[in-house]
């Protein structure tokens, strides 16, 4: 009899014990966001903003019982999140919060994107309810959790709408003119659109990259032919013809006190005489391209993360963070915290980098080299539509690596993010080594001077360490 009562007691305790949030929720969300950035042809800055706010919503939901204390005081102007009215389930709250943020930030996304995200959210809720069963408290817990998550999502969305992004939409920009200034002179042929069927516009969020790359894709193509323009006010596609996001540096940073809180080394002064700093840097680019090995070319393509072909570098590093957290066996809240810290670091890195880019409006290697050294010279990969200094890839990669090293240690890892794009997995001895390879890949591609890469790395390290010091994404 006593044994029977012990068994019954054990069963009752088990039925009341809260179900642990499944860490796979985090990786599922990150894959979805990567797919959205790709099919919507988002630029790196816009992708970083979308990912960062979604990551905030995911983390807030998974730490809902904390009443927002894990985020309070760590993000600029972050609102006080509503307190839960009773016990809530983290997964249900997270899905609800992310759903609200998605519906707000992605209101101008393609219909197929919006419907795919809605189906994903519905499937996650259905799976969670099945996991909870009668142990979860039934309909009341679900309703309470989803209501609380939606309330958090609305608070986060209101916070996002006050970051200055909307003020930059439609704002005219005329770049300064001068021999030392950037001009968007990449030939139109490298931006040739690809013809795709209507069926390929459907995003398969469980493996988005696999369905979006047509068989005839060229590694030089940047833009997929999709019915979406760069003039959207809330979710613009990348603008290849003009200056991409010239006012991005005016956005409110997430962790930095100001966009220029981390200093950057100024670019070399414009000069064409042999032996001058800029001429020497340009000759280094030419020599690197002339002796480019297949391995170096593969590295340039691996880290290109072009808009329209990938989730951009922001999605790439979020995927690295998610995969590494999963390999470590982190809990769902802890994994979401790692993704959040990484996404915030990348977002702030791009606000800082773009602020400096459009402050200095530095000439690109293609323009300088064709004018001064070789009029027929072309880089290995297309030149992006924004100024050179500092290098954006170097900045955001160094920022992400600094945060990941602070949170997880500067440890070896395997990156399989671009497997579906035709790139085999790469093994790295550390996050720092991966970031350094991402930076030098832009030299291999012929689109950055070494000075731009060096400045970007230093800037990114400063941003990443600032984010890490604020404890963003940490849990008690």
Where are these regions (language model features)?
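Sec-dependent signal peptide recognition
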Residues: 2-8
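Acidic/polar surface patches and capping/hinge elements
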Residues: 18-476
């Amino acid at each position: 009899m006593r044994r029977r009562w012990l068994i019954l007691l054990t069963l009752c305790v088990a039925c009341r014990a809260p179900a642990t949030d499944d860490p796979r929720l985090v990786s599922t969300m990150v894959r979805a966001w990567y797919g959205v950035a790709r099919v919507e042809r988002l630029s790196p800055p816009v992708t970083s903003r979308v990912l960062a706010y979604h990551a905030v919503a995911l983390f807030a939901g998974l730490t809902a019982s904390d009443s927002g204390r894990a985020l309070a005081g760590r993000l600029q102007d972050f609102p006080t999140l509503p307190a839960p009215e009773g016990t809530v389930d983290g997964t249900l709250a997270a899905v609800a919060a992310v759903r609200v943020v998605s519906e707000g930030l992605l209101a101008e996304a393609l219909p197929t994107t919006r419907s795919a995200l809605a189906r994903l959210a519905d499937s996650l809720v259905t799976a969670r309810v099945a996991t909870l069963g009668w142990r979860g408290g039934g309909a009341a817990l679900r309703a309470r959790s989803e209501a609380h998550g939606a309330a958090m999502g609305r608070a986060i969305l209101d916070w996002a709408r006050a970051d200055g992004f909307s003020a930059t939409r439609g704002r005219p920009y005329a770049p300064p003119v001068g021999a030392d200034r950037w001009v968007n002179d990449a030939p139109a042929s490298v931006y040739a659109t690809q013809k795709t069927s209507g069926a390929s516009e459907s995003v398969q969020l469980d493996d988005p990259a696999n369905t979006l790359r047509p068989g005839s894709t060229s590694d030089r193509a940047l833009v997929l032919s999709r019915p979406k323009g760069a003039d959207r006010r809330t979710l613009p596609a990348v603008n290849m013809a003009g200056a991409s996001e010239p006012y991005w540096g005016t956005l409110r940073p997430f962790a930095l006190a100001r966009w220029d809180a981390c200093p950057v080394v100024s670019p070399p002064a414009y000069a064409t005489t042999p032996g001058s700093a800029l001429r020497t840097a340009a000759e280094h680019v030419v020599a690197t391209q002339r002796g480019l090995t297949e391995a170096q070319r593969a590295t340039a393509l691996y880290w290109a993360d072009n808009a329209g072909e990938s989730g951009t570098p922001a999605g790439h590093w979020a995927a690295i963070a998610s995969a590494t957290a999963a390999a470590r066996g982190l809990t769902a809240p802890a994994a979401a915290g790692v993704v959040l810290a990484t996404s915030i670091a990348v977002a702030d890195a791009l606000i800082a980098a773009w602020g400096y880019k459009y402050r200095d409006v530095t000439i690109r290697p293609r323009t300088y080299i064709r004018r001064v050294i070789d009029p027929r010279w072309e880089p290995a990969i297309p030149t992006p539509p924004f100024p050179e200094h500092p290098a954006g890839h170097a900045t955001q990669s160094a920022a992400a690596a600094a945060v990941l090293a602070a949170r997880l240690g500067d440890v070896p890892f395997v990156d399989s993010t671009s497997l579906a794009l035709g790139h085999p997995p790469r093994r790295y001895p550390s996050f720092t080594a991966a970031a350094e390879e991402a930076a030098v890949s832009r030299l291999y591609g012929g689109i950055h001077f070494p000075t731009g890469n060096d400045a970007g790395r230093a800037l990114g390290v400063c941003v990443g360490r600032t984010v890490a010091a604020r404890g963003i994404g940490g849990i008690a």
